[in-house]
């Protein structure tokens, strides 16, 4: 590793208010499907779920906050969401 390379910050677990942002196609029921998938893996703070549509209405961003317990949990959430076919990105 050179001096100019930057390491990703290490996440310390558990994180009780870990933000997850999901960018997906806009579609009926997609928000509920996203929440159901995440709830299979983590507790969600239901009071902190936010939904926004893109200016043209093609995409929807869902931001929610979870209790993150480990890296495997985050990987599994990401993998299952991406496998839906309508989720484009998980941040």
From Swiss-Prot:
Organism encoding this protein: Pseudomonas fluorescens (strain Pf0-1)
Protein name (record): UPF0250 protein Pfl01_4965
SUPFAM superfamilies: YbeD/HP0495-like
Residues spanning the signal sequence: none
Family: Belongs to the UPF0250 family.
One family name in Pfam for this protein: DUF493
Any single GO CC term annotated in Swiss-Prot or TrEMBL for this entry: cytosol
Superkingdom, taxonomy of origin: Bacteria
């Amino acid at each position: 590793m050179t001096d100019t390379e930057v390491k990703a910050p290490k996440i310390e677990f558990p994180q009780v208010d870990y933000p997850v942002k999901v960018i997906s196609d806009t579609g009926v029921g997609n928000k509920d499907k996203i929440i159901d998938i995440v709830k299979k893996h983590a507790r969600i703070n239901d009071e902190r779920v936010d939904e926004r549509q893109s200016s043209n209405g093609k995409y929807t961003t869902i931001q929610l906050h979870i209790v993150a317990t480990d890296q495997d949990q985050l990987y599994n959430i990401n993998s299952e969401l991406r496998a839906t076919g309508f989720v484009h990105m998980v941040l």
